[in-house]
């Protein structure tokens, strides 16, 4: 979860740096949505997964078979649902939107980094929405 808490200063800095750009507030809101979605997923996984793992270690054979679907559901909901699908959509909006602002006003390396990360996130979102 610490990784998600390091994103808001970057979002706020880039919003302030490119404040003259159109829709920069929308892009910043999308960046903060990434933090909220990711933190909820991280807190859910950090709270539920250790208990399931501990129960699995001490469980009998039949109990282990009963715990597997619970852990698989948690994994699918958080990792595939929240982190790889739901989170990648606002991340794409934030990164590509901020890249468009950086293209006009900022240094070229910042634009390229934001653009590459945005395209990667867009590909992940598209794959998750269409491919699987």
Give the role of each language-model region:
Residues 1-132:
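Hydrophobic, aromatic-enriched alpha-helical segments typical of multi-pass transmembrane helices
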